[in-house]
Amino acid sequence: MNIPTIFWVVPAASVVALAFAWGFYRLMKREDEGTDRMREIAAHVRKGAMAYLRQQYKVVSIIFVVLALFFAYLAYGAGVQNEWVPFAFLTGGFFSGLAGYFGMKTATYASARTANAARQSLDRGLKVAFRSGAVMGLVVVGLGLLDISFWYLILNAFVDVTGPQKLVIITTTMLTFGMGASTQALFARVGGGIYTKAADVGADLVGKVEAGIPEDDPRNPATIADNVGDNVGDVAGMGADLYESYCGSILATAALGAAAFAAAGNEALQLKAVLAPMLIAAVGIVLSILGIYLVRTKEGATMRELLRSLGVGVNFSSALIAVAAFGILYLLGIQNWVGLSFSVITGLVAGIVIGQATEYYTSHSYKPTRKIAESSQTGPATVIISGVGSGMISTAIPVVTIGVAIILAYLCAIGFDVKNMLAPQNLSLGLYGIGIASVGMLSTLGITLATDAYGPIADNAGGNAEMSGLGPEVRKRTDALDALGNTTAATGKGFAIGSAALTALALLASYIEEIRIGLLHNGVTMLDLPSGATRFVQDASILDFMDYYHISLMNPTVLIGLFIGAMMSFLFCGLTMNAVGRAAESMVQEVRRQFREIKGILTGEGTPDYARCVAISTRGAQREMLLPSLLAIIVPVAVGLIFGVAGVMGLLVGGLSSGFVLAVFMANAGGAWDNAKKMIEEGHFGGKGSDCHKATVVGDTVGDPFKDTSGPSLNILIKLMSMVSIVMAGLTVAWHIF
């Protein structure tokens, strides 16, 4: 199949993204790192972060080799899988890990430079931190599109099939590299989350509550580990998470597009449907770069003004991609291009609404978080109760928003043909519309991820300023940047969860297409439906497959899968919460030991052993991340082998529905507890050191693993289970008990 000229826009956009990422990195490196003390602290954090990442990549590499060998056996030995899968799996993991490495390397160099820039002005500090965060955003989208372009070119050259089926095979094969990205992302998120929260909880409980010293105080032995953790969890982890969503949404939509137009036999239209999500993402990169340059602020800006500064860039990029979608789909000549353009807009609007809802429930500018701070007057128990209640209530808007986005994207794609919305052609086109909505939501990831990666950079800059003893004016500026970072981080988590839900739904639909390929690969060409009718596998609709495998709520295997999927979210959260608890216990004991045995720490005369705390967090994270992460891979395989395709569909639906709601609850409750504590630290209800402050520190400590370990990891869990099911579809079709 000839490569159309317009395709080359996709790799070109990825190169542009990487070039600008390199440019922003070089600009950041030219900034002065400040005093000798600031350089020393930054070096400690950088050394700890890189040591952790090296150790994590060693462990993950072993797991990747084992899985790649297993996939190679399935492909070349058992013959139940596409021969390209082992290689696609490895490249997905490699590029995901590479994105995390570059993002974290940039963040560890940027923190001291941001603190030093804040000595000049608030605007200067904001620009250094935000453009350093933009390196992460642009590296993720650049490497993502580069990987997609690479595999499209390779498979187009080597897949020896003609006709519409060629694009179906290419897109479903490309989808499997998402499992590599998902696996890498889960280890990065879970391991990073355990690391950062073990350090954070240890630093807070012993430092703030017991010793009564401020946050980021150099006398606290866990403070360097805490700062390392911000980079490990919130930069490398978040980057890998959104890399996976970004690639997954594009690839799932391309696979749905290939399937939607395969039956019609129109290869030209089929190719356009495959290229559309890639081109929307490519144009989104350029518009994200333009938006990055619009972010600036004035001295003495309030929180609302700082949020508006970031909002200008994000909203500019989002508005332009909404307009650009019409142009892209019109030029491609896609069927119902107007409706599909509105599907893109649906995804964009859903992302914005979820972000705003998250801000409302987590920022202390609004009533829910202020009520949590107010409840601290009666102790930590009421702080916990009000935070849990607020987090549960906060699930309503995101869930309704995603529901509305799904039905609108579907109806827009089929031209609001409500009477025939489940007709085979409309079903395929409607699911493609949902996929294109997820691409729309993530199309401006270059700038939305920049606002998210900005958070830990600003947080580390504040820590550097505190530990370096910079003046109150500088600390005031870094506090303002840090407070903004807390809000953008919470908003970013909401965005990541929403995008994960839409991406997982697109992957769920793609699973059926992978079943089709699995049947053909196993030599099955005809389906004998329960009604007595027969269908060629190649021409069967999604509804035919649902009928063939008895995918109905009356089928006990579907119900069993549904319950296991719902249980997986809670089991996974329980394991990760306990992992943080165990790792934090070790950290608390170590900090207490140092306060007790190293003379002069609390008076500032002795030097804490920072390296030992870093080592404890690293060991704890590596040990504790294995069980929950491997469970996410093993359970979908086991369900497929026992309960077959119907059981897997139940598993994915149960995991998506419970995981999405639970992730929103945990992220928002944790964010609200954090900002309630920040509100009191600003002087409300007695300020720092008061009983109210201690009560909110307890709430924040409980919320830490909620918002930074378990909650964000659920995004990846629901996508990884889908990806594993897709990769194992051939195995499930060939061997299952029920």
Language-model regions, residue ranges each:
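Hydrophobic packing and interface segments
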Residues: 1-738
